C-alpha cells in the first residue's frame, strides 16, 4: 500500500510538471526526471537504512501511525509528510559551482597569480635559484594562505582576534620585511642555484613567504575586489547558506572542508602549471634572441625588484590615513574631529589688487569623496553631483562665472560709452575737423636750452621702448613660451608644412649651391677647428698678464717636464682643441663609415661660396653691375699676369746665386731672451734652409723632403762675426751660442774641470766630448725606405752638436725638388760659407 501510494503521488507530480512546463515537457525531460528520481530514491533508501533512522521511526510508530494513516486515507501525498522539500532539488538547474570542491579548485587560480609580493618572490626563487628554492617559497605561500583560510572558515578566534587587534602593526611588520628584502636584493642579491642539501637557506625561503602571506597585503586585486567563480562576495565564503544551516556536518563542515581541499590542491596544480609556462617562455626567449641565461636572469632579477618596490609603495596610499593613523588612535571613519584634514573644494585667496576683496578659486574635490553631497542642501541651491566636477565640459559650465575674467565689468562700460559717443558724433564732427587741422608756421625761432632738454627728456620718457610695451607679457613666463613652441614643433602637420616650405626655398637656388650632408659636416668641423684656433691665440696673448710666482719657469709652466723638444710647442703654443672636440671622434667616424649615414640639417641659412676662385672680386659687392665687375676682374687678371712675369724674371736672375733668402721660419722659445719667437734663419749643414733653382729644367720626381722638422736650439744668423771661426774648427753649431750662464751649466752637466768661459776654448772643449747626434735615419740611406739617396749622406752629417737650449719646430716653405737640390749641392760643395 505504501509503494502504491508513492507511485500515485509520483504520477501526480508528473501531471503538475506537465502543467508547469507546458510545451517544454518532452520525452527526454520525462526520462531524465525518471532516472534522477529513481537514483535519488535509491540514495534516500540507502541513507535511511544506513543511518538507522528506520529504528527511530519504528520506535515512534505508535505516535506517527495515526497521522500517516489518516493522510493516506485523505489522499494526501506521502512526500509531503515524510520527504523534505530538498528531495526535489534535482528538478532545479544546478550551476557548475554548486560543488564546493570544484569551486575551491577554480577559485585557487586567483590565489596563485603572481600579482603579490610573496608570489613575485616565489617566482624569482624558482627562475633564478632553481627548482628546490622555488618549491620551498611556493610551499610557504600556499600553506600560509591555507592556514589563514582554515582560521577564517572554522572560526579560530584565539588566532584571528589578536592578529586583527594589532592592526596596523601587522601591516607595518610586513612593510618592514619587504623593505629588508628589497635592500638585500639591491645590495646582496642571491643569484646562486641551490640544491636540496642547503636546508637552512631553503627554510628561510619557506619562512619568509609564510610570514608575508599573513602580513603583507599588497596585491593588484585591491582595486578590483575579490575575484571568484561563484556568486559569493569573497573567497572566504564557500556557499550562500543560511545561519540556521551552519550547524550540521553535511551543511557546514563537509562543504567547507571540500572547499578548502579544492583550494589546496588547486593552488599546487596552478602553481606548477604557471611555473612550467614561465620556464618555457624563458627558455624560448633565450633561444630565439640568443641571450645568455646569466644575462636573462639578471634582467628578471631587476624586473621583479622594480615590481616589488612598486607594490610596496602603492600599498601606502591605498590604506590611507584612516587605516594607518586615525583608526589605531580610536577615531572612526569620517569623524568630525578630523574634518580639518579633509580637502575642501573651495579656497579663498586674497587678490593682489585689493587686500579686502576675496575671490574663490575652484578645485576639484577628492575622487570618490561624496560626503559633501550627503549634507543637507538649501532649496535655492541645486545639488551638485560628482559628474558635474569630474567631466571637464560640465565642470567648465558649472564654474563659468568663476572663470569669467576680472575686467568683464570694465569692458561692458566701455562698450556702452562707445555706443553713446556714436549717437552724438555728428554734433562733434566740426570740432574734430577743426581740431586736427594743421597750423601754419608764421614765425620761426630757435629753441632755448630748456626747451631742448624738455624735448630730449620727453622723447626718452614717453618712448614705448622705455616702458617695454612691445615685450609686454612675453618674457614673464619663459616656460609657457617653451610649451607653446613644443606644442607646434611636435605637431606632425606643422612639421610637414615647415619642411615643405624650406624645401621649396632651397630648390630655388642653383643645384651646385646645395651641399651634401657630408660636405656640411666637414664644413662645420673646419669652422669649429678655426674657432678653437683663434681662441687659442687669444689665450696665448693673455699669458703675459698672468700672475707671476716665485717658482721657476719650468716648474710653473711645464710641471717639471721641461725637455726642450716638440713638447714645448705643444705646451706653450698649442692649438687648444678643447674637450668639446672629442665629439668629433664619433662625428668623423660617421663621415668614414658606410653603414651609418650623416643626416642633413634642415635650415634656411646656407653658406656662401664660389664655384671658382676667380669668379668674383671679394672687395666688390655681389649686387654691383655685371659690367663693372667684369672690367675690374679683367684689370685684376692683367695685373696678376704682369706680377707673375716680373717674378719669373727675378727668379731667372737669382738662379745663379748660391743661396736665396731664408724662406723657412722657426717657432720656439729663446732661452737667452726668454721669449717665444718666430724667426727667419738658415741652418748650416741642413738642407731645409735652402731653396735652389736650376737653369736646365729637369723632370719632377715625386720624392721630396718633409715639410717640417723639430729642432732643439736656434740656428745661427749669416751675419754673425764668429760664425766662420767656429765653423772652421769642425764643430757643427746650427744655433745661437750659449750665454755665459748657460755655458757654466753645460760645463757642470758634462763635469768639465777648470772651465772658463771663452768663445775660443768653448768650441775646443765641447768638440772633444761625446755629445748626442741628430737622428737623421729617416732621411739617410740607412733605413729601409730612405727619402734621400745615399750620395747625400756626406752633406747632411752634422757630427757633434752642442748641448741643446730650448727647442721648437721649423717649416721650410715650399717643397724642395730633389734634382734642383742636387745641382745646388754640386755647385756649392766646397763653399765654406754654406
From Swiss-Prot:
Family to which the UniProt record says this protein belongs: Belongs to the ycf78 family.
Its membrane topology: Multi-pass membrane protein
Transmembrane segment boundaries: 30-50, 101-121, 125-145, 167-187, 261-281, 303-323
Protein name: Uncharacterized membrane protein ycf78
Compositional bias (Polar residues): 407-417
Compartments it resides in: Plastid, Chloroplast membrane
Originating gene: ycf78
Superkingdom in the source lineage: Eukaryota
Region (Disordered): 397-424
Species the sequence originates in: Tupiella akineta
Coiled coil start-end: none
Keyword Plastid tagged: yes
Keyword NADP attributed: no
Cellular component terms (Gene Ontology): chloroplast membrane
UniProtKB keywords: Chloroplast, Membrane, Plastid, Transmembrane, Transmembrane helix
Upper taxonomic lineage: Eukaryota, Viridiplantae, Chlorophyta, Ulvophyceae, OUU clade
Chief location: plastid
Amino acid at each position: 500500500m505504501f509503494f502504491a501510494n508513492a507511485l500515485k503521488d509520483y504520477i501526480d507530480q508528473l501531471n503538475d510538471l506537465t502543467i508547469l512546463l507546458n510545451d517544454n515537457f518532452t520525452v527526454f525531460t520525462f526520462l531524465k526526471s525518471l532516472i534522477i528520481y529513481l537514483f535519488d530514491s535509491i540514495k534516500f533508501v540507502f541513507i535511511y537504512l544506513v543511518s538507522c533512522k528506520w529504528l527511530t521511526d519504528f520506535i515512534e510508530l505508535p505516535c506517527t501511525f495515526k497521522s500517516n494513516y489518516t493522510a493516506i486515507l485523505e489522499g494526501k501525498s506521502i512526500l509531503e509528510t515524510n520527504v523534505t522539500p530538498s528531495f526535489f532539488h534535482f528538478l532545479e538547474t544546478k550551476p557548475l559551482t554548486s560543488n564546493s570542491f570544484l569551486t575551491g579548485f577554480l577559485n585557487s587560480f586567483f590565489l596563485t597569480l603572481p600579482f603579490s609580493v610573496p608570489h613575485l618572490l616565489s617566482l624569482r626563487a624558482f627562475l633564478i635559484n632553481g627548482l628546490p628554492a622555488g618549491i620551498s617559497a611556493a610551499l610557504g605561500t600556499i600553506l600560509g594562505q591555507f592556514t589563514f583560510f582554515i582560521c577564517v572558515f572554522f572560526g579560530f578566534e584565539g588566532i584571528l582576534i589578536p592578529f586583527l587587534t594589532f592592526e596596523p602593526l601587522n601591516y607595518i611588520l610586513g612593510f618592514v620585511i619587504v623593505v629588508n628584502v628589497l635592500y638585500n636584493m639591491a645590495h646582496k642579491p642571491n643569484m646562486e642555484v641551490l640544491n636540496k642539501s642547503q636546508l637552512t637557506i631553503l627554510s628561510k625561503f619557506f619562512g619568509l613567504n609564510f610570514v608575508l602571506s599573513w602580513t603583507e597585503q599588497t596585491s593588484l586585486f585591491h582595486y578590483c575586489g575579490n575575484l571568484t567563480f561563484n556568486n559569493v562576495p569573497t573567497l572566504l565564503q564557500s556557499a550562500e547558506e543560511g545561519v540556521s544551516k551552519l550547524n550540521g556536518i553535511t551543511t557546514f563542515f563537509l562543504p567547507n572542508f571540500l572547499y578548502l581541499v579544492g583550494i589546496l590542491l588547486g593552488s599546487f596544480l596552478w602553481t606548477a602549471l604557471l611555473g612550467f609556462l614561465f620556464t618555457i617562455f624563458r627558455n624560448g626567449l633565450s633561444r630565439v634572441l640568443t641571450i645568455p641565461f646569466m644575462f636573462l636572469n639578471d634582467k628578471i632579477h631587476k624586473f621583479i625588484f622594480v615590481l616589488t618596490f612598486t607594490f610596496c609603495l602603492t600599498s601606502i596610499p591605498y590604506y590611507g590615513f584612516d587605516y594607518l593613523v586615525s583608526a589605531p588612535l580610536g577615531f572612526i571613519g569620517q569623524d568630525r574631529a578630523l574634518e580639518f584634514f579633509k580637502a575642501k573644494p573651495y579656497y579663498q585667496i586674497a587678490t593682489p589688487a585689493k587686500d579686502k576683496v576675496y575671490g574663490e578659486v575652484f578645485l576639484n574635490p577628492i575622487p570618490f569623496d561624496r560626503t559633501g553631497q550627503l549634507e543637507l542642501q538649501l532649496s535655492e541651491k541645486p545639488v551638485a553631483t560628482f559628474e558635474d566636477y569630474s567631466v571637464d565640459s560640465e565642470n567648465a559650465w558649472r564654474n563659468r562665472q568663476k572663470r569669467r575674467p576680472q575686467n568683464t565689468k570694465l569692458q561692458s562700460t566701455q562698450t556702452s560709452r562707445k555706443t553713446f559717443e556714436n549717437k552724438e558724433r555728428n554734433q562733434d564732427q566740426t570740432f574734430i575737423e577743426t581740431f586736427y587741422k594743421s597750423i601754419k608756421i608764421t614765425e620761426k625761432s630757435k629753441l632755448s636750452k630748456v626747451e631742448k632738454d624738455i624735448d630730449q627728456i620727453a622723447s626718452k620718457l614717453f618712448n614705448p621702448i622705455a616702458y617695454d610695451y612691445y615685450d609686454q607679457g612675453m618674457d614673464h613666463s619663459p616656460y609657457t613660451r617653451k610649451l607653446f613652441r613644443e606644442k607646434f614643433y611636435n605637431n606632425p602637420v606643422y612639421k610637414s608644412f615647415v619642411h615643405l616650405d624650406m624645401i621649396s626655398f632651397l630648390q630655388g637656388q642653383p643645384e651646385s649651391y646645395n651641399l651634401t650632408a657630408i660636405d656640411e659636416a666637414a664644413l662645420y668641423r673646419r669652422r669649429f677647428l678655426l674657432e678653437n684656433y683663434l681662441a687659442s691665440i687669444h689665450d696665448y696673448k693673455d699669458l703675459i698678464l698672468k700672475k707671476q710666482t716665485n717658482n721657476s719657469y719650468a716648474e710653473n709652466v711645464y710641471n717639471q717636464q721641461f725637455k726642450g723638444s716638440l713638447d714645448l710647442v705643444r705646451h706653450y703654443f698649442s692649438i687648444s682643441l678643447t674637450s668639446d672636440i672629442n665629439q668629433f671622434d664619433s662625428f668623423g667616424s660617421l663621415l668614414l663609415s658606410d653603414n651609418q649615414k650623416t643626416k642633413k640639417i634642415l635650415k634656411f641659412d646656407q653658406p656662401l661660396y664660389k664655384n671658382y676662385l676667380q669668379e668674383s672680386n671679394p672687395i666688390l659687392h655681389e649686387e654691383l653691375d655685371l659690367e663693372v665687375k667684369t672690367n675690374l676682374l679683367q684689370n685684376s687678371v692683367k695685373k696678376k699676369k704682369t706680377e707673375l712675369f716680373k717674378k719669373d724674371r727675378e727668379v731667372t736672375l737669382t738662379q745663379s746665386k748660391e743661396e736665396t733668402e731664408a724662406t723657412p721660419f722657426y717657432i720656439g722659445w729663446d732661452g737667452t731672451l726668454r721669449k717665444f719667437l718666430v724667426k727667419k734663419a738658415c741652418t748650416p749643414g741642413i738642407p731645409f734652409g735652402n731653396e735652389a733653382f736650376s737653369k736646365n729644367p729637369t723632370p719632377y720626381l715625386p720624392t721630396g723632403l718633409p715639410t717640417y722638422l723639430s729642432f732643439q736650439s736656434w740656428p745661427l744668423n749669416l751675419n754673425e762675426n764668429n760664425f766662420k771661426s767656429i765653423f772652421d774648427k769642425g764643430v757643427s753649431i746650427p744655433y745661437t751660442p750659449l750665454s755665459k750662464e748657460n755655458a757654466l751649466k753645460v760645463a757642470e752637466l758634462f763635469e768639465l774641470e777648470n772651465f772658463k768661459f771663452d768663445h775660443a776654448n768653448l768650441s775646443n772643449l765641447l768638440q772633444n766630448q761625446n755629445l748626442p747626434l741628430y737622428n737623421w735615419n729617416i732621411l739617410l740611406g740607412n733605413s729601409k725606405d730612405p727619402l734621400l739617396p745615399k750620395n747625400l749622406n756626406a752633406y747632411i752629417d752634422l757630427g757633434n752638436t752642442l748641448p741643446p737650449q730650448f727647442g721648437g719646430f721649423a717649416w721650410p716653405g715650399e717643397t724642395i725638388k730633389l734634382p734642383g737640390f742636387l745641382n745646388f749641392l754640386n755647385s756649392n760643395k766646397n763653399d765654406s760659407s754654406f
